[in-house]
Amino acid sequence: MDVGSCSVGNNPLAQLHKHTQQNKSLQFNQKNNGRLNESPLQGTNKPGISEAFISNVNAISQENMANMQRFINGEPLIDDKRRMEIGPSSGRLPPFSNVHSLQTSANPTQIKGVNDISHWSQEFQGSNSIQNRNADTGNSEKAWQRGSTTASSRFQYPNTMMNNYAYASMNSLSGSRLQSPAFMNQQQSGRSKEGVNEQEQQPWTDQFEKLEKEVSENLDINDEIEKEENVSEVEQNKPETVEKEEGVYGDQYQSDFQEVWDSIHKDAEEVLPSELVNDDLNLGEDYLKYLGGRVNGNIEYAFQSNNEYFNNPNAYKIGCLLMENGAKLSEAALAFEAAVKEKPDHVDAWLRLGLVQTQNEKELNGISALEECLKLDPKNLEAMKTLAISYINEGYDMSAFTMLDKWAETKYPEIWSRIKQQDDKFQKEKGFTHIDMNAHITKQFLQLANNLSTIDPEIQLCLGLLFYTKDDFDKTIDCFESALRVNPNDELMWNRLGASLANSNRSEEAIQAYHRALQLKPSFVRARYNLAVSSMNIGCFKEAAGYLLSVLSMHEVNTNNKKGDVGSLLNTYNDTVIETLKRVFIAMNRDDLLQEVKPGMDLKRFKGEFSF
């Protein structure tokens, strides 16, 4: 039922007419073999009759229904200004079955009856009293059309009368005042009366005034209307000085906002090297907002306090040897941490530290290290490429787009400059969206690839990343496979291919790609973690647990021939791995193992059951 049809300011005959038709149908059925349960909608197409209301017969008294019947049969009409339209409305709502096409009605005629009631809303919505209250009811018809369960915060009464019949289309309906206490009392009193004597009824006008007064007293509608009218008058009579004051406050707010924004932009320029925020990129202030958001939220690299390589002048060389010999990435990271502690401007140490941490499933530390590298060497291609990937992994897509732009400008300055000159219209526009930025950068990289005589696997990587950010995994897979045809022994690319296959719901193929990456680099922690996730997706939980335990074991390091602060390592950086392991044990119904999973746990507890 439309919310507007409940208003006392509109024609109260509408409610009486609906219920009188219901009672008339029931009386007709009583005369025909007493078939009280037969629906009046069966075999009829009368508008305005709803089977949904049959469950609530005698919603008003028999006395009022008889009077209403006299009116319908040709008794004197009330004034034309309050006349209701008996014919069907042309502005009828679409059938509920069209709104919720995935649900099937158990009784189509019942749903049709519910729909037929909606023709009353067109008359009631034309009333001035309702139009003056459109803040509460103006969107009620739209709410019905989209299957909303709430029409107005002021009219949220449960309509239990409708629920039993419209369940196939809507779970519940709100916005009806038919179940307010006043009407509930009328329903109960109406059931006790059997006969109707038309000659003993009061005049029609007295009945309507009585009904309207009763509803107004119980629901306080008149008070609400008066309050809203008073508020409207106050707003119309508001002095001009108040409006001027509001304008002054608005200007002050704008001034304060601009001051804060300029401060944020200045902070971004101080943190990043000038090459990353200068006007050469010409990407507009809106983009710098996205990039600045990442920069302003940047955290310093979190060093491990217990590090045996501190004060070792050969820490960088030791780290390189550990990586070349396939040692644990966590141990190599400690060596590089010691190297940058010893020499904070060591560009290669920061770069390798960032590469190690991103492969070691410690993304945030990797991002911090790579950003430090770019501060020292803004044109470091490897740092820019890896940082763009990490930004995408962490959801900083806009920052990744700018990093890819800077990477292409650095590696192919002449070609990239020519491409950007041909398409500088976009660069001068402001207010572009994430999708626009993606499409623009992708178009430029495609032009760059077409200008090269041979396939550059790094260009294919960048294109794959751009397609990845808009969930176009098929094109992402094509790009990564093209790169692997040029360099088939790139374990990082095999891992990226596996991630794309996994996101395409091709877990079996993803597992093969991860295995290939681990064959090329057994210490590749991220590939091992991704392998565990894909194993979970196909229900191989025991194998997944083994891979996750391997990841945790590879984060353990020995310091001074003693176990290091493994618990701190796990608790600080490997919460994701621990939580994933918990989910695996839950899926296996192994509460005994679940209780053992915590930071600093002894992995030997799991050796007997899992292979890692």
Swiss-Prot record:
Motif WxxxF/Y motif 1: where in chain: 120-124
Entries under SMART domains matching the protein: TPR
Region spans: Amphipathic helix 3 (AH3): 158-174
Chain positions covered by the region annotation Amphipathic helix 1 (AH1): 7-29
GO cellular component terms given for this protein: cytosol; peroxisomal importomer complex; peroxisomal matrix; peroxisomal membrane; peroxisome
A molecular function (GO) term: protein-macromolecule adaptor activity
Effect noted on mutating residue 24 to R: Loss of UBE2D2-dependent ubiquitination. No effect on its function. Abolished monoubiquitination by PEX2 and polyubiquitination by PEX10, leading to impaired protein import in peroxisomes
Function: Receptor that mediates peroxisomal import of proteins containing a C-terminal PTS1-type tripeptide peroxisomal targeting signal (SKL-type). Binds to cargo proteins containing a PTS1 peroxisomal targeting signal in the cytosol, and translocates them into the peroxisome matrix by passing through the PEX13-PEX14 docking complex along with cargo proteins. PEX5 receptor is then retrotranslocated into the cytosol, leading to release of bound cargo in the peroxisome matrix, and reset for a subsequent peroxisome import cycle.
Protein name: Peroxisomal targeting signal receptor
Organism, as annotated: Saccharomyces cerevisiae (strain ATCC 204508 / S288c) (Baker's yeast)
Upper taxonomic lineage: Eukaryota, Fungi, Dikarya, Ascomycota, Saccharomycotina
